[in-house]
From Swiss-Prot:
Keywords, ordered alphabetically: ATP synthesis, Cell inner membrane, Cell membrane, CF(1), Hydrogen ion transport, Ion transport, Membrane, Transport
Family: Belongs to the ATPase gamma chain family.
Protein name listed in UniProt: ATP synthase gamma chain
An annotated GO cellular component: proton-transporting ATP synthase complex
Family annotation (NCBIfam families): ATPsyn_F1gamma, PRK05621.1-1
Length: 293
């Protein structure tokens, strides 16, 4: 059994760690709130872009952009969004489990896969897991820009346009609330029919207006679809950042609480040992006094 000195040293060490985890919990809570705000701010842009594209698509039923045309699937691409840092509970592990399940389903159909990665944890995962990584971005921080995240998106879209891949997915942790983050795999290209389904009812009425499109509908669709896809990926990154901070906050709170429980247990052991030592000393004194008398 450990001595009183060893237990005191262990309690001191755990208290020091507890201070760190409590501080990390508070920092993560603050960052989570800011990430939520940025996540909410980005949504109107994507919604507005979707409405504009819906108008264009319905106004030009004779033109189908390649990003909207389904074709036989021989190879798929995944844009995988992870965190740069750890200490976020099972956030990245749960995402990788969902990803590997999806990959396995395609492999069972003899469909190959390639990957574009955002986040250092994803890069580390694929070094061990294997797989063809065409592009990677790390150290994107808490407030990434479109320019920082653009290369993986463009690499995937270029491969799709060249016929190297036939479907693109975006993989990220969807922020549900502070306690819940959901690993999510959404089809990005070709754009699923549901992408503009919410706009259809309103568009039928609005199309009675006579719109003038400049320079022309085809050019606008070609330009806006790429930006729309970029906005979807950017929004997914913001959701993943909020998920990362909320998961870290929960993990650090659990670590802080566990440290408190461990300190209490050690303190109880310490008190019992100290009481036993005092009792033993008293017994020795009483025994010595009896022997002298």
């Amino acid at each position: 059994m450990a001595s009183l000195k060893e237990i005191r040293a262990k309690v001191t060490s755990i208290k020091s760690t507890q201070k760190i985890t409590r501080a990390m919990q508070m920092v993560a809570a603050s960052k989570m709130r800011r990430a939520q705000e940025r996540m909410e701010v980005g949504r109107p842009y994507a919604d507005s872009m979707r409405r504009v594209i819906s108008h264009l698509v319905h106004a030009s039923s004779d033109y189908k952009h390649p990003y909207m045309v389904n074709r036989p699937v021989n190879k798929v691409g995944y844009i995988v969004i992870t965190s740069d840092r750890g200490l976020a509970g099972g956030l990245n592990i749960n995402l990788f489990k969902a990803l590997t399940k999806s990959i396995q389903q395609y492999q069972d159909q003899s469909v190959q896969a390639e990957f574009a990665v955002i986040g250092a944890k994803g890069v580390s995962f694929f070094k061990n897991f294997g797989g063809k990584v065409t592009s990677a971005v790390t150290d994107y921080g808490d407030k990434p820009t479109f320019e920082q995240l653009n290369s993986p998106v463009q690499a995937m879209l270029e491969d799709y346009s060249n016929g190297k891949i036939d479907r693109i997915y975006v993989v990220y942790n969807k922020f549900v609330n502070a306690m819940t983050q959901k690993p999510t795999i959404n089809q990005l290209v070709p754009l699923p029919d549901s992408a503009f389904a919410e706009e259809e009812s309103g568009i039928q009425t609005e199309l009675s207006w006579d719109y003038i499109y400049e320079p022309d509908i085809k050019t606008l669709i070609d330009e806006l679809l790429g930006r729309y896809i970029e906005s979807i990926v950017y929004q997914a990154v913001m959701e993943n950042i909020a998920s990362e901070q909320s998961s870290r906050m929960v993990a650090m709170k659990a670590a802080t609480d566990n440290a408190g429980d461990l300190i209490n247990d050690l303190q109880l052991v310490y008190n019992k040992l100290r009481q036993a030592a005092i009792t033993r000393e008293i017994s020795e004194i009483v025994g010595g006094a009896a022997a002298v008398s």
